[in-house]
From Swiss-Prot:
Entry binding sites for NAD(+): 69-74, 103-107, 127-128, 140, 149, 167-170
Residues of the signal peptide: none
Gene: aroB
Protein purpose: Catalyzes the conversion of 3-deoxy-D-arabino-heptulosonate 7-phosphate (DAHP) to dehydroquinate (DHQ).
Pathway in which the depicted protein is active: Metabolic intermediate biosynthesis; chorismate biosynthesis; chorismate from D-erythrose 4-phosphate and phosphoenolpyruvate: step 2/7
Protein name per Swiss-Prot or TrEMBL: 3-dehydroquinate synthase
Binding site for Zn(2+): 182, 245, 262
Cofactor remark: Binds 1 divalent metal cation per subunit. Can use either Co(2+) or Zn(2+).
SUPFAM superfamilies to which the protein is assigned, alphabetical: Dehydroquinate synthase-like (SSF56796)
Species classification: Bacteria, Pseudomonadati, Pseudomonadota, Gammaproteobacteria, Aeromonadales
Cofactors that this protein relies on: Co(2+); Zn(2+); NAD(+)
GO molecular function term, any single one: metal ion binding
Main location: cytoplasm
Gene Ontology BP annotations: amino acid biosynthetic process; aromatic amino acid family biosynthetic process; chorismate biosynthetic process
E.C. number(s) listed in UniProt: 4.2.3.4
Organism name: Aeromonas salmonicida (strain A449)
Length: 359
């Protein structure tokens, strides 16, 4: 078993990674302090893993809530359902929430944990590749608003992240590919050697080879933990984790949440960011081609929707959380393995990239 730690003083927490972790009760129960637990999951994950988790928690008073599946349900209405479920059964501050599912479940349950009675503990049990390598670690919790993604939320750290790589065996191929976008992101912004490893080992990952999966997930979590330890609330280096997300969030908001998976939109966004960097002279043509080829090898889109023009992108991008003093700030790669935040990308530069980057 791989065991990492996010070092945040009194709020530090472990990340545990292995195949078959959800067969062992002690892994899940070690950070639960009270006697009451509420598991929140969705209609896809519940038939696969809910009963198993309930059995692991045989010594606790366990309730569960099953939500609809999909990004379309990452809303204030879903958040309110969780609040109502907790209130109706008189849960207190000693209750532990368990987020059993992918990124949507993790984000909305984390936000509920941050908000209920001003904060109760929660545990992340991510079941998708995207949530295992990215969204379950770092304490970003949120719901979407019709005008923007993740606009309502909080920084609130889990008590524990339990990553069972066996869960990926039940993940649809499209969802696996979407998760690979975040894996590739870490190589682009932080670790050129990891990027090269991905170029060589993509087929092993797609074949779900246990050793390859364990290494990739661990490396992503190591990078994420390092970044979060340095900059928990995203005032500096953590912003680099948003590579592709400014363009990507615009695609998601414009096309309707869930029509493009988050990872698919981020992949197209990373290609647009890389193209912007190449046009500015910060990325050479060979590096741009390597990024494009790796995204394609992962079965990810490299172009934005054909019917999404400059005005649609800009309308959403101006609402991005990285906008500062009215200036749009973009994360752009500087070679492979490094990235920077820039605030001087002109509308003409964006127009050129958007027009050339559509299907």
């Amino acid at each position: 078993m791989e065991r990492l730690k996010v070092e945040l003083g009194e709020r530090s927490y472990p990340i545990e990674i292995a195949a078959g972790l959800l067969q062992h009760a002690e892994v899940l129960t070690q950070t639960i302090k009270g006697k009451r637990v509420m598991i929140v999951t969705n209609t896809v994950v519940a038939p696969l893993y809910l009963e198993r988790i309930i059995q692991l928690l045989s010594g606790f008073q366990v309730e569960h809530l099953i939500l609809p599946d999909g990004e379309a349900y990452k809303t204030l209405a879903t958040f309110e359902r969780i609040m109502s479920a907790l209130l109706e059964t008189n849960h207190g501050r000693d209750t532990t929430l368990i987020a059993l599912g992918g990124g949507v479940i993790g984000d909305v349950v984390g936000f509920a944990a941050a908000s209920y009675q001003r904060g109760i503990p929660f545990i992340q049990v991510p079941t998708t590749l995207l949530s295992q390598v990215d969204s379950s670690v770092g304490g970003k919790t949120a719901v979407n608003h019709p005008l923007g993604k993740n606009m309502i939320g909080a920084f609130y750290q889990p008590k524990h992240v339990v990553i069972d790589t066996e869960c990926l065996k039940t993940l649809p191929a499209r969802e696996f590919a979407a998760g690979m976008a975040e894996v590739i992101k870490y190589g682009i912004i932080w670790d050129a050697e990891f990027f090269s490893w991905l170029e060589t080992n993509m087929s092993r990952l797609q074949a779900l080879e246990p050793a390859a999966l364990a290494y990739a997930i661990r490396r992503c979590c190591e990078i994420k933990a390092d970044v979060v330890t340095q900059d928990e609330t995203e005032h500096g280096v953590r912003a680099l984790l948003n590579l592709g997300h400014t363009f990507g969030h615009a695609i998601e908001a414009e096309k309707g949440y869930g029509n493009w998976l988050h990872g698919e939109a981020v992949a197209a966004g990373m290609m647009m960011a890389a193209s912007t960097a190449e046009a500015r002279g910060d990325l050479d043509a060979r590096q741009l081609a390597r990024i494009r080829d790796l995204l394609l090898a992962a079965n990810l889109p490299i172009q934005a929707p054909a019917d999404m023009d400059f005005s649609a992108f800009i309308r959403h991008m101006r609402r991005d959380k990285k906008v500062l003093e009215g200036k749009l700030r973009l994360v752009l790669p500087v070679g492979i393995g490094h990235a920077q935040v820039v605030a001087d990308v002109s509308d003409d530069e964006l127009l050129a990239v958007i027009e050339s980057g559509r299907e």
